[in-house]
């Protein structure tokens, strides 16, 4: 009996271990599963079957002491052993809890202080803009110009063209990058003259494809602080006069002498119902309104939510798009890199910008500035950003604990905007203390047009699933104010369950990064078993959109490559429908090592940076000799 009990216990323990190992791992059909070594051998051999064990060990790099793959370097030692063979064999001494904590801390979060290539690293000799733009006049700097003026010399030293056809020339009839274009042979004539297709150019004449660019004169005014903020100044004066903007109320006046009564605090002298104000504040009913209900909202994704990616999502069925988070202080300083985040493609019919800030004066000024300088349909306040840099300054999630400042920001921005004001929040700051339900009624009273709730707290991040029960509770409290839910939606079934909670719509973030065709799946109510060829075509489209947006010269090509690599760090986590044992894929389950149905599908499943670069080289040519890339997100749970 004792022996029997012992063996049962042993079997039970083994089952428990197996269960623990399988937890959090996606279930893939057995015929596609493989080992880590075989997976990388297959990739390194360009899809050729390697039968010889000796060759296999050579290709896999048996002397791991000298060569360590990028993904292994980021993985804690204890976890690597556990994931590779599921046992702790080979460990002379089990790691202490302190060592485990240290390893986990090192592998989580983001890669901060990442190296970025400078513009000067893209090419040694840069051609002078006066030559590139074929200016009639000579270079303004003359002999002191640091750039190259000899076109023949530039062409002889320039890297080989990536491919024979230029997307910009074939689409618009002219490539503005001329001889510097990495596809220049298709539009260069005699003496390196840039060719123009007049008929094709006429088709685009008068069309504005990208809006919201920063004007040079406005940039100078912002840098010299010459921009006047009339509406903001009036709002702030009103705040200062009352001592507390939250207690400002209009006096109750009897109808018979209403025309004769003047508010004591009013800065404007009135005569009856007429004032001498040049700009009269719009009433809520006169503001532009948007019907947000039952729409698919692409989240404002930092780094990855760029204009080319939004164009792709728009094509797949996204209804609402929003620019990446922009810092209000940087916008007020006229920083071109920050203003670039506000650009809008003409295909984005419902488009907003997201602002981050911690103080009423800067946020209200920024809202007033954008209201009169750019074309947007709504402005969103980021009250969900969890990063320390923002939180410690009182912005992002920090505003959820600073309700007085939060109210002043919302009321101030609402007073200067002609478009709806929306807010994105989290469930709370601390993991088990939800406070969103307390804020939502206030947001409704302050004049917010839409609230988007991410079903996680700041401290929780992505360690647990989004709390959709709490989102449902908040949606009920918010009514009639529209509330969108956000979190863990990666299939149309997830979307249907989310909509059953009573939310007005859903926001897609990581799900859209893993599979941008998710919008199509939701609208057509189907699982799309997309092929690797179709996925590669999506990357081709992103490449073309990137070259159009960032440029087809060396700098533009490398910018496009960089953002493609950032996106590939998410795309590689997608598991094709045909390989799954249970459809759909769960967003919190990491993919095991598997062989795809063809080489490209297998290559796209690799979480090794080297393989992402290989994909980028198929579209953008070889990387420069000094190229380096470190992914922004370590994504430890998926390695």
UniProtKB/Swiss-Prot annotation:
Catalyzes the synthesis of dihydrouridine, a modified base, in various RNAs, such as tRNAs, mRNAs and some long non-coding RNAs (lncRNAs). Mainly modifies the uridine in position 47 (U47) in the D-loop of most cytoplasmic tRNAs. Also able to mediate the formation of dihydrouridine in some mRNAs, thereby regulating their translation. It is an enzyme of class 1 (oxidoreductase). The active site is at 385 (proton donor). This is tRNA-dihydrouridine(47) synthase [NAD(P)(+)]-like. It comes from Xenopus tropicalis (Western clawed frog). GO terms for biological process: mRNA processing; regulation of translation; tRNA dihydrouridine synthesis. The lineage of its organism: Eukaryota, Metazoa, Chordata, Craniata, Vertebrata. One of its GO terms (molecular function) is flavin adenine dinucleotide binding. Gene3D superfamilies: Aldolase class I, Zinc finger, CCCH-type. Residues 66-85 have a biased composition (Basic and acidic residues). Residues 103-119 have a biased composition (Basic residues). It catalyses: 5,6-dihydrouridine(47) in tRNA + NAD(+) = uridine(47) in tRNA + NADH + H(+); 5,6-dihydrouridine(47) in tRNA + NADP(+) = uridine(47) in tRNA + NADPH + H(+); a 5,6-dihydrouridine in mRNA + NAD(+) = a uridine in mRNA + NADH + H(+); a 5,6-dihydrouridine in mRNA + NADP(+) = a uridine in mRNA + NADPH + H(+).
